[in-house]
Amino acid sequence: MFLKNFTVNNKTALVTGSGKGIGKACALALAEAGANVIILSRTEKDLLIVQNKIKKLKKKCSYYVCDVTNLKEIKKIFSEINKLDILVNNAGTNRPEYFTKIKRKDMSEVVDLNIKASFDIAQLATKVTVSYTHLTLPTSVTV
């Protein structure tokens, strides 16, 4: 267990970008600590792998294949969520390029995902949360 002294029994957590990497690790750690988890990613294959691991922990797990920069998709997802206690707004990207070589289009994609989508999701999450909700926004902007 990643979080020995941390318990979130019967809480509902939503983790964006949870098909791989940090998001996957957060989703699994929250399930190990007792949470039911809603996972979001663009790749269904990755989500199914994470969902199977969470279900082996005897926790509920639902998933949504989506592009979190698409506000219409995100609004639809949040319209289906009745309860949310924890948000890990993990989806993010960067452009590993010299600053002088980054194209404006690429920078716009980074801003759309790392800033605008994170804002939209956090704002929508506040409409379905219960008191003492935890919002985590680990996305950082790196140029």
Protein language model features and the residues they cover:
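Substrate-binding pocket helix/loop in short-chain dehydrogenase/reductase
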Residues: 98-99, 103-111
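The beta1-alpha1 cofactor-binding region of Rossmann-like NAD(H)/NADP(H)-dependent oxidoreductases
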Residues: 45, 64-76, 104
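A short, exposed helix-loop element centered on a Lys and neighboring polar residues
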Residues: 122-123
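Conserved small/polar residues in nucleotide/adenosyl-binding loops
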Residues: 133-139
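Conserved glycine-rich cofactor-binding loop
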Residues: 12, 19-21
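Flexible N-terminal pre-Rossmann segment of NAD(P)-dependent oxidoreductases
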Residues: 1-11
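Conserved glycine-rich Rossmann-like NAD(P)H-binding loop of the short-chain dehydrogenase/reductase
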Residues: 35-49
